[in-house]
Amino acid sequence: MIDTARFSAAAAAEGFELTARQLEQFDQYAQFLVEYNEKVNLTAITDPEGIEVKHFLDSLMLLKAVELPEGASVIDVGTGAGFPSVPAKIVRDDLRLTLLDGLNKRIVFLGELSRRLGQENTLSLIHI
């Protein structure tokens, strides 16, 4: 769904060298986001380039702005569709995430997304 070559180049320009597996995970994320968004409104941004830049690349800027030690535990309060924490997790697999949101429909989406990305063992979901 996303243009992985374009996204890889944009990420590299910001200092993020993405592996083939990471690019696959970003593509899976984008596909599932658009698919699920047809049933439940998660985002207004659903075009491939918009997802690459406004969701994924912008989310990765967290890793440039905040120094997170190896294995850091991070909580994303009001996570919505998982931005910026899930893209950061794709790049930094060592992070332990807790995603907290007030809408259960988002938690359901994130639960399925974490399974699809193989992150269910290092990601916790909380509905408040």
PLM regions and their residue ranges:
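Class I SAM-dependent transferase core
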Residues: 2-69, 115-117
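Short, conserved SAM-binding/catalytic segment
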Residues: 111-122
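Short alpha-helix immediately C-terminal to the canonical SAM-binding loop
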Residues: 106-108
